[in-house]
């Protein structure tokens, strides 16, 4: 399984049997490939403050790989009025160079999947073109609201879309933030 954690508020402690004990905070993204197997836990780093986060599990396209952990900072200024790719497929172009994630592509997972984050001014129009034919899209509104084909998506709304090549969104409020996940719709185990 490919497990992606995105803190929205506060921070989490990640601990696993591979020796990782890390704090992942708002403004960072954590990726773990469970591969051949790993025991792990995530919990709130603060005894008194609330933590909010997304944890997304994606079926991998390869089995029995060596488990791995990666954590990168997000350049939130780079996602202003544009979609910033934060996750792409392995061994995607420039996905890793000298063991470090390539700034433009974020980090990677064992799947033909793409994760994009963006924060938009009110009225800003966004076009997302699918990277791979046959993939589907899941939209998740983190903050604010977006319009899609006359439908309003509010904070914490999600929507799955299939059989399309392009989607067009419009930010309905100032500071509207969205996560766009593009994943295969069919089993693609190698």
Predicted feature residues:
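Jelly-roll (double-stranded beta-helix
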Residues: 1-190
